């Protein structure tokens, strides 16, 4: 796992920030049918901290913004890592920190705001889709009947999963509309084949890339499009997480 790229810098017209991929004790949900990203974890919290500290030592504060991602949610980062993040953020005068989390951990967000008092915190949720049947019966996200409006009360950013067999273009466009209505920023992660049984719908993906919607979204500063198989025409994330399968959907 340690051969992954865990530090990067995003610097384009959409956003400027440093990104770190840390390691936690493991996604507490870990039941999403499309995701094998959760294999990057270790129950040994001291080992996690030692690895995470080395990654965090690379942070310079160049853009005053830091995004912290992991294989699950912020609650699965050990306490020493959280303390070290706070130390680095304070020393580097970083004004905004972005964490990711599963909807099931929404009630812990208020405690993070207390810990990082005086620092602007933003939170990403991997809603993947707002189609209730697709989200719960097919993707098995474990978010119950939560609506985009209720989700946005806790999270100001969302990841959307696109390009898997069984999804329709119409439902995808509805996801985009709802995402832009209720969230500050959305990230469209185009499904990349991994160790799960989910398959990429290349016909659907190409329909998107040949559409006016794609060009409009690519030019929208609130939207990031990531496709590991088409990096030349989509946005980048500085290859953080490179070296093994990562479909991009957060918890």
Regions found by a protein language model. Name each.
Residues 4-50:
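Canonical Radical SAM [4Fe-4S] cluster-binding loop centered on the CxxxCxxC motif
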Residues 37-52, 59-79, 89-107, 120-146, ...:
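Core AdoMet radical
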Residues 143-200, 209-232:
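Conserved C-terminal portion of the radical SAM core fold
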